[in-house]
Amino acid sequence: MNDTIASTVRLTQYSHGAGCGCKISPKVLEKILHSDMEKWVDPHLLVGNETKDDAAVYDIGNGIGIISTTDFFMPIVDDPFDFGRIAATNAISDIFAMGGKPIMAIAILGFPIKLLPPEVAQRIVDGGRFACRQAGITLAGGHSIDAPEPIFGLAVTGIINTDKVKKNASATAGCKLFLTKPLGIGVLTTAEKKGKLKAEHQGLATEVMCQMNTIGAKFAEIAGISAMTDVTGFGLLGHLSELCEGSGVRAEVYFDKIKTLDGVQRYIEKGCIPGGTERNFESYGHKIGAMSDLQKAILCDPQTSGGLLIAVDADSEQQVLEIAADDSIELFEVGRLFAKEHDSPILITVL
């Protein structure tokens, strides 16, 4: 099989899930990660999994921290090269979400060798290699297995000054919430998988998913950004609820300010809602105030390689907007943080 034939393979037909939408639901994941074993605390581990942050951070001394993360999933698009590029971009994003700089990656590949020829896998890995080059790092190795469905991703190592780490559990009341990418990736990729995506929307989600969140490293220099995380498989409300829970704050989300990819509402009306949307809502819906069906479909939509969600204090807002503009990133406000009401289980109100 040559590259031309490889590019005609519809990878999404070989997987039951798609991108970050195939994540195990937050509710089930919590049960999996629960342990009765005595916890061993490493004083050098600055960020672990207690707050469900994007990556782990380990203090190696002299004010330097190592960031470690891994992310992989099944095809979200049909083209093998694009799949590899998206999966790699998504994995590298976790380093930027902590405010760090990636330095190296290794690949994770699962491939159905009896169903698809190796040329398809080669294109997937090349896509990953391309994304790594964009991030200024080397794809230094990896591991592969024969699997029933295609799987690809990276384990990524990064570096950061320990006093610059941006966590998802350090947000403060009064901050505005901004997002760097529009929502609706799960909706558009579901429309593509169902064969309902219009010609004018072909490649739109791919373009957004391939945008590298490099600006996260610049945001690390701004003390007035009290928290940062990337929005991926649990949707905006899922990752925002983790931020609120870990930080002891509540949020208001302004739905009329939410930006979505072109055509999202139309595809929602046609039933192009990924299964991950309902799984997400079932996991954290009890923490969210009343919503319309449209609000739920957009705000719980699982994103793959989504944007950075940042909490910004008033004094730093202009600086943040200027840095984003210099990188040709259109930040948009999605809400605001407030002191938590201790007698209410609701963390997020959608207005």
From Swiss-Prot:
Q: Name one GO cellular component term.
A: cytoplasm
Does the record bear Metal-binding in its keywords? yes
Positions annotated as active site in the UniProt record: 20
Q: Which cofactor does it need?
A: Mg(2+)
Q: Which SUPFAM superfamilies did the record assign?
A: PurM C-terminal domain-like, PurM N-terminal domain-like
Write the Enzyme Commission number(s) for this entry.
2.7.9.3
Catalytically driven reaction(s) = hydrogenselenide + ATP + H2O = selenophosphate + AMP + phosphate + 2 H(+)
Q: Which GO terms describe its biological process?
A: selenocysteine biosynthetic process
Q: Which HAMAP family match?
A: SelD
What protein am I looking at? Selenide, water dikinase
